Amino acid sequence: MTGQPLLGDLLTLASDALPEVEALFETARSALKERVTTDGKVSSKALEEEQFAAHALSWLATYVESLRQMRAWAGRLETEGRFGEMEALILQIAFGEYLAQIRGGIPMSQTETARVQDIGIELGHPGEAVRRLIQAGNTPAARARLVALMRDNHGRATFGASGLDEELEMIRDQFRRFADERVAPHAHGWHMRDELIPMEIVEALAEMGVFGLTIPEEFGGFGLSKASMVVVSEELSRGYIGVGSLGTRSEIAAELILCGGTDAQKAAWLPKLASGEILPTAVFTEPNTGSDLGSLRTRAVKDGDEWVVHGNKTWITHAARTHVMTLLARTDLETTDYRGLSMFLAEKVPGTDADPFPTPGMTGGEIEVLGYRGMKEYEIGFDGFRVKAENLLGGVEGQGFKQLMQTFESARIQTAARAIGVAQNALEVGMQYAEERKQFGKALIEFPRVAGKLAMMAVEIMVARQLTYHSAWEKDHGQRCDLEAGMAKLLGARVAWAAADNALQIHGGNGFALEYQISRILCDARILNIFEGAAEIQAQVIARRLLD
């Protein structure tokens, strides 16, 4: 291992490299847009035929935005006098690696690599800043020095300053302690026994304000920022993704009601959601529809002052012991697309293990799953299930899909935050094992490839963090952020899976044993590329947004 680990003019190099990759992205976007445009509009058929190129563009855009946010993060820290050696190494390795991948190939999955040639453009010679960062950014010396600093900073919530303000870091500390004391010691047992998260944990979260975190104070919540929601989700998911996901249900339900509910619905439902008095579940997906929500077939027919629901739903998280369903159903039976869908706040009686669905008109059964346990997944059948007419969201039919889309930004930001928490957990577990496990007379962490895995985990977690924090900042400031939130979710899910897989690899054969918690973390990480929009769907949505 030779050479100095840290480049002397790093911030200047990073600034100088950005215009080159931004120009590359614009060239790629123009080239693809020309191929998929018919009569002045982007053709859905042509875009599908060019799907690989379109998704390559999405990943290229995600990398460019990630580097942009990393440079902005470094600049803020530099101004505040907090840009130290660890932060500099993280920035340098991130730029070195991501620039190399932009020019050589970005992994979309284990067997799919996105290259700019797929989009139909040729690469020229790199500029001096890009060349230097690729050549000397992500080096063995840089990775080794970063891991040495990480070992000197055991117990820190993040490796490298997060860039968040003191108030948000205080929130992080509070929930980190809770996760360490009340969640992490029991998470593996809950997973292995496939148990629901105990109600005392749910009640403790309610007392801490998790379910009303972003609900306005006038409705009984704390009125905090989406950034605070991100930090809370990160830390709880670091303890156990199931616990970190409990707040997601309330976040989605509250956002639906805030954006689309009547004044009476807001007054009736939001205080109870904020306090945790009622627990909600999202009931959208149907068998054979997956992400194609516009083709839902569950129907609701008006009968006096009630709606009568018939149909089937699947992959419903935390369905049994909740009190209300945000239920998407077709009220205009003449339609076959999203225009005939309506959203309901459908009340139900919480179930038990012995009788999960006691409400008349409802039946259901558990779907056994690989990971992401703790709330359980269910199939539900509706046969004459009744909903009060006053519980039609907004009091207007046909607005369900539009109302749901208004929640997508927050949902994707929250999912990205959960991914960061899972990745951070994998890093901490992998690093602890690498320091404690001895082979050939020394700790595993002393071997360069093991240390290198840990270094790249820390770097990519910070990249995902900055992209997610930026999305939350945009949301908090009233800016449209569906594109950035989608990118954060797309990248965060890949980072979590890579971190879990590499941490398990560090464990060797022990990682394959169920008794080691990394086996659970791997299973939990796998869902992040699937739910809330599979990676392929997410890339398609991003591409469409970039090209429109």
Swiss-Prot record:
Substrates-to-products reaction catalysed: (2S)-methylsuccinyl-CoA + oxidized [electron-transfer flavoprotein] + H(+) = 2-methylfumaryl-CoA + reduced [electron-transfer flavoprotein]
InterPro entries for this protein: Acyl-CoA_DH_CS, Acyl-CoA_Oxase/DH_mid-dom, Acyl-CoA_Oxase/DH_mid-dom_sf, AcylCo_DH-like_C, AcylCo_DH/oxidase_C, AcylCoA_DH/ox_N, AcylCoA_DH/ox_N_sf, AcylCoA_DH/oxidase_NM_dom_sf
EC numbers on record: 1.3.8.12
Xref: SUPFAM superfamilies: Acyl-CoA dehydrogenase C-terminal domain-like, Acyl-CoA dehydrogenase NM domain-like
Keywords associated with the record: FAD, Flavoprotein, Oxidoreductase
Gene Ontology molecular function terms on file: acyl-CoA dehydrogenase activity; FAD binding; flavin adenine dinucleotide binding; oxidoreductase activity, acting on the CH-CH group of donors, with a flavin as acceptor
Cofactor binding, per record: Binds 1 FAD per subunit.
Consequence of gene loss (knockout): Cells lacking this gene are unable to utilize acetate or acetoacetate as sole carbon source, but grow on succinate or propionate plus bicarbonate.
Active site residues of this protein: 532
Cofactor(s) this protein requires: FAD
Activity-pH behavior: Optimum pH is 9.2.
Domain of life of the native organism: Bacteria
Subunit structure: Homodimer.
Record-stated family: Belongs to the acyl-CoA dehydrogenase family.
Protein name, entry field: (2S)-methylsuccinyl-CoA dehydrogenase
Organism: Cereibacter sphaeroides
Gene: mcd
